[in-house]
A protein has these predicted regions:
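Acidic, small-polar-rich N-terminal luminal/periplasmic segments of exported/outer-membrane proteins
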Residues: 31-167, 531
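Transmembrane beta-barrel wall of Gram-negative outer-membrane proteins
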Residues: 169-171, 176-206, 211, 215-257, ...
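Solvent-exposed loop segments that connect transmembrane elements
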Residues: 210-219, 256-293, 338-348, 389-415, ...
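C-terminal beta-signal and adjacent terminal beta-strands/loops
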Residues: 662-670, 690-742
């Protein structure tokens, strides 16, 4: 009832806003600029694209002062982007319409495709991309399996960087913020129109942490990030251009520290006296105060290299060929305290190496007849290696050590290596039945193989040849799409679509013994039926879009416990396909130019998420129980963002002020819906101001002014029997900057 009331209230507000706006629109002389998107692998007006997509231009992005894509979560309905804080490289939890994954392990494939310059980022670590030198951002909601492929069951975040201009020029930005934060961004363009070059450099250093470690009374949470990008663009002839982009990134930071939320019945409290004082309150009493008895300053590191080669060839007036080669490698090191206490109960030293290579070739038609299409071939290879040391201080509970002494720590060394090879063919065709009705049909066939090799031993690199722990598995899948759109007039589009997405199966990357590491789990699929309209009203001064969707989730992959006689505690956590779920909802987007100075943007997402079937074992008893009553993770029934922008001429320059409020409804962050990690409603308020004088911009920004401290991650270890940990979002931040264009 509360959700229905909230939706009714927001809907009334929207139509009141439209009515009020229509009264004053006559004072404005400028209309809304056309937004061009590439959501369907070709350039289209966003209002003529028959799918749910939100988009930001370069100017929109700059005026919001985002650090990374997390700061853009409010730009789309039904979108949550959280930093999992479970390692360097900002492992990311992206949930669109309640569909997502929140885990750092690389065997957990993404549900949302983060795509940079046409290249898919294949792991959650490194997916929290920095918003540097971006030309556009597109957020596609719903399965995008046809054109973007596997692991896009929730949607796609498509980012495109600016191209070299071929002229000498550039931009330098220098900024400073609280927590002793320094920002330096630079862009240099040079060359000629036929051989254009661009160098982008970035240094962002937060020298003071926002956390206090109660063990040594020093700060934690510091971070330093640097990036250098070289971009070249060559015009081979009038019909072909080749672009090469090389990016090197380095991130050094304090390892994140978990908060202990274990209550009276948990092992942490009952046995070791490490207790939470109340529901949702950490042991420290404050979400920004932690216990870390092995603090190491900036010892967590993430190194990344990305190379992208793209060939764009206009074969003729009717056909265009695109080829994209993407190569990405990462190397991460982190020693992390997970128990959230002054003791060493569970710490990990977790290093990981990852690499991916992708090839995509596609042909796009531009025919004069009723039929046009995109057809292509895609190849993907990736692998990762993790040698991990777990330092466990609670084995005494299972008779593994002679006494209940938290000073006795048992090291366990796990080695995991997994590989993925995938190939796919895809197509999507539009057929104009008449001048108003278009039928779209598409599909993608995927053939994928994964392998896993794992073992334990007395040292960090045990000999896996001593035991047969290798396994591989092959899956195939066809994901279809059918849509029909009706262009009622040049300002109004209706559409109805059916699409399907596929998320890969795999092998457990987090395991208790070698044999659970080679136990496969199946792929999962999401099927979406969606109806929508896109409208441009009031003489091109109001854009209003609406979508209604019904998504069915099959073979949902979740972590469960199984009996395991080989494990020291008699149980093991594995990934299995244990649930079916439904996600239904409504999405509204509105942008209005009130007059030549004032504009309003609003998006609203209503979501009804539930499990249809959920039978699993979370106690290691061997008998699954019915958990259908639980709510899916990060699936608030209501999200909305309201932005107000005012621009005016102030003296010799141009002033700009934007204020926004981003509301996230109450939701769970732990799979078992622990009330300890439950997030109440949050409303994050941001403010940005700038003054542009000739080629210089002076700016101020503030984020999370309301200091919302909701949890970005929550986990019940052994179904909450051992302890529950969580980590909170960053507090309020502010900064100033000067940008000079030359």
């Amino acid at each position: 009832m509360k959700s229905i009331f909230n939706l009714f209230t927001i809907t009334c507000f929207i139509f009141i806003s439209i009515f009020c706006a229509s009264i004053s629109f006559a004072q404005s002389s400028e209309g809304i600029e056309e937004i061009v998107v590439t959501a369907r692998k070709k350039e289209e007006n966003i209002q003529e694209t028959a799918l749910s997509v939100s988009a930001l231009s370069a100017r929109d992005i700059e005026n919001r002062f985002p650090t990374d894509i997390r700061d853009l979560a409010g730009e789309s309905p039904n979108l949550i982007i959280d930093d999992l804080q479970q390692g360097p490289g900002s492992p990311t939890a992206i949930f669109i319409r309640g569909v997502g994954v929140s885990d750092v392990e690389k065997n957990f494939d993404p549900t949302t495709g983060v795509v940079l310059d046409g290249v898919f980022v294949g792991a959650n670590s490194g997916a929290m991309l920095k918003t540097i030198d971006l030309e556009s951002v597109e957020i596609l909601r719903g399965p995008q399996g046809t054109l973007f492929g596997r692991n896009t069951v929730a949607g796609v975040i498509n980012l495109t960087r600016s191209k070299p201009t071929g002229e000498v020029g550039g931009k330098l930005k220098v900024g400073y913020g609280d927590y002793d934060t320094t920002i330096i961004d630079g862009i240099l363009n040079f060359g000629t129109p036929d051989a254009a070059f661009k160098i982008t450099g970035t240094l962002r250093e937060q020298a003071e942490g926002y956390l206090t470690n109660l063990v040594d009374n020093k700060d934690l949470g510091r971070e330093e990030y640097s990036q250098i990008t070289f971009n070249s663009l060559f015009a081979v002839n009038d019909n072909m251009e080749v672009e090469l982009t090389l990016t090197d990134e380095q991130q050094d930071q304090d390892a994140h520290t978990a908060l202990n939320l274990g209550g009276a019945t948990t092992w942490w409290c009952a046995v070791y006296g490490q207790c939470s004082p109340g529901l949702g309150i950490p042991q420290s009493g404050d979400r920004y105060k932690v216990y870390n008895n092995e603090p190491k300053r900036r010892d967590a590191s993430f190194e990344s290299f990305t190379g992208i080669l793209e060939v764009r060839w206009q074969l003729s007036e009717k056909y265009k060929l695109d080829y994209i080669l993407g190569r990405k490698t990462t190397d991460e090191v982190v020693d992390q305290d997970w128990d959230g206490t002054p003791l060493t109960l569970y710490h990990t030293d977790r290093n990981a190496e990852y690499e991916q290579t992708s090839h995509e070739i596609r042909i796009t038609s531009d025919l004069e007849g009723p039929l046009n299409y995109v057809v292509g071939l895609y190849k993907w290879d990736s692998e990762y290696t993790i040698p991990m040391e777990s330092r466990i201080g609670f084995f005494d509970l299972f008779g593994a050590v002679p006494t209940q002494d938290p000073l006795i720590v048992v090291p366990i060394y796990n080695y995991t290596h997994q590989e993925t090879d995938s190939i796919a063919v895809f197509f999507e065709a539009d057929y104009d039945i008449n001048e108003q009705i278009t039928l779209t049909v598409g599909g993608r066939y995927i053939d994928e193989e994964k392998s896993s090799n794992a073992c334990q031993g007395p040292g960090p690199y045990p000999d896996c040849s001593a035991i047969n722990t290798y396994a591989d598995k092959t899956w195939t899948k066809f994901t279809p799409k059918v849509a029909v759109s009706y262009q009622a007039n040049e300002d109004l589009l209706y559409y109805l679509s059916y699409s399907q997405g596929y998320r890969s199966g795999g092998f457990n990357g987090r395991w208790g013994n070698e044999f659970s590491a080679v136990r496969p789990y199946k792929p999962e699929t999401v099927t979406n039926i969606e109806a929508g309209l896109k409208s441009t009203l009031l003489d091109n001064r109001l854009r209003f879009n609406l979508a209604i969707f019904d998504m069915e989730y099959e073979d949902k992959q979740l972590d469960v416990d199984i009996p395991d006689t080989l494990a020291a505690i008699g149980r093991a956590t594995v990934t299995d396909n244990v649930a079916e779920a439904s996600f239904k909802g409504v999405e509204l987007e509105l942008y209005a130019i009130i007059n030549q100075n004032f504009s309003v943007d609003l998006n609203v997402g209503y979501l009804d998420a539930s499990y249809d079937e959920f039978f699993a074992d979370f106690t290691g008893s061997g008998t699954p129980a019915d958990f259908t009553y639980l709510e899916p993770l990060r699936a608030p029934d209501l999200t909305w963002t309201l932005g107000l922008t005012y621009e005016w001429e102030a003296g010799p320059g141009l002033a700009y002020v934007r204020a926004s409020a981003h509301h996230i409804g109450e939701h769970h962050t732990s799979q078992l819906n622990s009330p300890t990690t439950f997030n109440k409603e949050q409303t994050l308020v941001d403010l940005s101001m700038n003054y542009e004088l000739n080629n210089t911009v002076f700016a101020f920004f503030a984020k999370n002014i309301t200091e919302e401290d909701g949890f970005t991650v929550g986990y019940d270890v052994f179904a909450g029997a051992a302890w529950t940990y969580a980590m909170a979002r960053k507090p309020r931040t502010w900064g100033i900057s000067i940008t000079q264009t030359f």
